[in-house]
Amino acid sequence: MQVSIPVCYPCPSFPQTRPFAGDGRKFGRVDSGFMPKLWEGLSVGAGAAVGACARLALTMQFGEGLWPILAINMLGSFLMGRYRPGPFWGTGVLGGFTTFSAFAVVLVDVPLPHAVAYLTVTVVSCVAAWLMGNRWSA
């Protein structure tokens, strides 16, 4: 998608523009891909909202303890490996669905040996889930 923006003076915050060939107007065409990046960012944000709502629904159903968070993170990791989704589904929906910050917050409330064990189990199982999903997709 190409967007025309008025070019009145050089502005360092906008990408460089060039006039359309032969029309002589003071409008330019954005060459840097600004709009596709904007739409991609908006789609990632919308996807993250969807994923966070799905995670909230599951945590309301199953609780916010250590094991539901681990199951959510493993499921999200498996789906990432299985489908290798693009920005909306991958970074957005599954990024909002998985909750690595929440498992870090939960670790503050448990004794250190349990926290280290849970951290290890989470990282190893999520990597294993991604590898299993990736292998299944091949």
From Swiss-Prot:
One of its GO terms (cellular component) is plasma membrane. Signal peptide: none annotated. One of its GO terms (molecular function) is fluoride channel activity. Na(+) is not transported, but it plays an essential structural role and its presence is essential for fluoride channel function. The keyword Cell membrane applies. It is found in: Cell membrane. GO terms for biological process: cellular detoxification of fluoride. Keywords: Cell membrane, Ion channel, Ion transport, Membrane, Metal-binding, Sodium, Transmembrane, Transmembrane helix, Transport. It is a multi-pass membrane protein. The keyword Transmembrane helix applies. It catalyses: fluoride(in) = fluoride(out). Its main location: membrane. Na(+) binds at residues 95, 98. The chain crosses the membrane at residues 34-54, 60-80, 88-108, 112-132. It comes from the Bacteria. Belongs to the fluoride channel Fluc/FEX (TC 1.A.43) family. Fluoride-specific ion channel. Important for reducing fluoride concentration in the cell, thus reducing its toxicity. HAMAP family: FluC. This is Fluoride-specific ion channel FluC. It comes from Corynebacterium efficiens (strain DSM 44549 / YS-314 / AJ 12310 / JCM 11189 / NBRC 100395). The lineage of its organism: Bacteria, Bacillati, Actinomycetota, Actinomycetes, Mycobacteriales. The gene is fluC.
